[in-house]
């Protein structure tokens, strides 16, 4: 019976992969040259003009790309906005995404996807524990699910994992995930899909973080793209007052594409005017930045929404019309935008206690995960799996003592601009996101509890005991003399 189920999973995966490759052939993949994105067919410079898209909130376990009715409702609205890219924070890798991905492709919209979920991510409390084979199985299964879609622009290995000076040690494990993802993509013979990191704009370590993820002699361990969550331009600001001029200097020698993975300060009296669009898509910034994504599509509790959703009804807010107007009137720079062809990667920052505590020697990939490189990740486990459950459990006491930390890094941190300081005097408070804050711990705990209700005996095994299917999968394969 189990073998029959696993065989069925193989057939389903093959069918979805075939649907993916046949549905997106008309969408040219995006490739990287120097520090810029380019259309692989036309050769034109590609600038991200997008929005962050996660109806229900970015720490929600709901997958917006697995519900055909949601995509039928929202994609025409996204098309009307004039965008070419969406960023999605959480997906269920066990679901069928072919309808939504095809609809996005038909409307010229690319996807940047975070591979983590609120219950499967690198834990800030114990990154070493959460970096385990079961976590990587979930990451690799997400890659398997989406890699055949040409309109997947890239994957984020982490989002705002480093949200304070005290969490810089987690960078070591996120960088290991970058390495593992890039090696997995190569081993599975997928096209060269960019893998990056989305950073909080924290003055104390933003330069160190950028350098760290782009340093070292091992190319697979260096990111392909760097996203910055930046809320420094508020209202009718300017290139200098907002601090954008400082960011230009900071990243001017960066060898991979840099873009704003979240932007759109809402600390304004009424609606957001989005005057920063004129700067972002100008020759003043195009030599370094490749566009950005506005936070966010749907209006949630933090009031950053462009639209209000009520069932199947979408109401466009004033912010939507303002952004649409800015996108429509501001063209991309002509030619290649002055991009750099330099491939000089950064020098690794030195370890310094209390300042930068990331190690330049990365941990070896968990040995149990090596089988996935030849066989694939196996059956996707979806959002019901909690790969950091044992890590969170042993840190319960720490959670009670530290209200400001978040327990995972799957989406954005609960207060992006509070942690992401800038030269601008304003402070933004982006309240929902992928790395649940202490106030959101109950969501993560509930999901973990639901997952473990029938697996209470696994706790003694550590994180490796949480996902059993892949181990059984490998054992059966070996029994039938399959090469893994």
Swiss-Prot record:
GO molecular function, one term: 1,3-beta-glucanosyltransferase activity
Ranges of biased composition (kind: Low complexity): 405-462
Compositionally biased residues, Acidic residues: 394-404
Compartment(s) of residence: Secreted, Cell wall; Membrane
Gene Ontology cellular-component terms listed: endoplasmic reticulum; extracellular region; fungal-type cell wall; side of membrane
Modification after translation, per record: The GPI-anchor is attached to the protein in the endoplasmic reticulum and serves to target the protein to the cell surface. There, the glucosamine-inositol phospholipid moiety is cleaved off and the GPI-modified mannoprotein is covalently attached via its lipidless GPI glycan remnant to the 1,6-beta-glucan of the outer cell wall layer.
PANTHER family: 1,3-BETA-GLUCANOSYLTRANSFERASE GAS1 (PTHR31468), 1,3-BETA-GLUCANOSYLTRANSFERASE GAS5 (PTHR31468:SF5)
UniProt family annotation: Belongs to the glycosyl hydrolase 72 family.
Full protein name: 1,3-beta-glucanosyltransferase GAS5
Taxonomic source organism: Saccharomyces cerevisiae (strain ATCC 204508 / S288c) (Baker's yeast)
């Amino acid at each position: 019976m189990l073998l029959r189920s696993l065989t069925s999973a193989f057939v389903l995966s093959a069918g979805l992969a075939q649907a993916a490759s046949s549905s997106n052939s008309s969408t040219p993949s995006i490739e990287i040259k120097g520090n810029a994105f380019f259309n692989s067919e036309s050769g034109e410079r590609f600038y991200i003009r997008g929005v962050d898209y996660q109806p229900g909130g970015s720490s929600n376990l709901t997958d917006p790309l697995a519900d055909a009715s949601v995509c039928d409702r929202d994609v025409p609205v996204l098309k009307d906005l004039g965008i070419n890219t969406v960023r999605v924070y959480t997906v269920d890798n066990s679901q069928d995404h072919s309808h939504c991905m095809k609809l996005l492709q038909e409307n010229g919209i690319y996807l940047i996807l975070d591979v983590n979920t609120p219950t499967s991510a690198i834990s800030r409390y114990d990154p070493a524990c959460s970096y385990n084979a079961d976590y990587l199985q979930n990451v690799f299964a997400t890659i398997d699910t989406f890699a055949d879609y040409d309109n997947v622009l890239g994957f984020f290995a982490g989002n705002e994992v480093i949200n304070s000076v005290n969490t810089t040690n987690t960078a070591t494990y996120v960088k290991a995930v970058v390495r593992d993802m890039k090696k997995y993509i190569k081993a599975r013979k997928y096209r060269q899909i960019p893998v990056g990191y989305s950073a909080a704009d924290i003055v104390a370590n933003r330069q160190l973080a950028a350098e760290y993820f782009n340093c070292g002699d091992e190319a697979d361990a260096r990111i392909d793209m760097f996203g910055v969550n930046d809320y420094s331009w508020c209202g009718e600001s300017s290139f200098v007052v907002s601090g954008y001029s400082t960011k230009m200097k900071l990243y001017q020698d960066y060898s991979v594409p840099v873009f704003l993975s979240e932007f759109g300060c809402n600390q304004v009296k009424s609606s957001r005017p989005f005057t920063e669009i004129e700067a972002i898509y100008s020759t003043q910034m195009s030599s370094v930045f490749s566009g950005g994504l506005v936070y966010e599509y749907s209006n949630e509790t933090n009031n950053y929404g462009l639209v209000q959703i009520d069932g199947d009804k979408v109401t466009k807010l004033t912010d939507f019309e303002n952004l649409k107007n800015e996108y429509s009137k501001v063209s991309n720079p002509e030619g290649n935008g002055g991009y750099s062809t330099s491939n000089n990667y950064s020098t690794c920052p030195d370890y310094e206690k209390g300042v930068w505590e990331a190690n330049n020697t990365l941990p070896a990939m968990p040995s149990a995960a090596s089988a996935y490189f030849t066989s694939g990740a196996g059956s996707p486990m979806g959002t019901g799996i909690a790969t950091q459950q044992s890590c969170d459990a042993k840190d319960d006491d720490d959670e009670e003592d530290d209200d400001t930390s978040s327990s995972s890094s799957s989406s954005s941190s609960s207060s992006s601009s509070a942690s992401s300081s800038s030269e601008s005097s304003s402070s933004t408070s982006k309240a929902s996101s992928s790395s649940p804050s202490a106030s959101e711990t109950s969501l993560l705990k509930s999901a973990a509890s639901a997952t473990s209700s029938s697996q209470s005996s696994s706790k003694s095994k550590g994180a490796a005991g949480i996902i059993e299917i892949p181990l059984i999968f490998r054992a059966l394969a070996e029994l039938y003399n399959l090469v893994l």
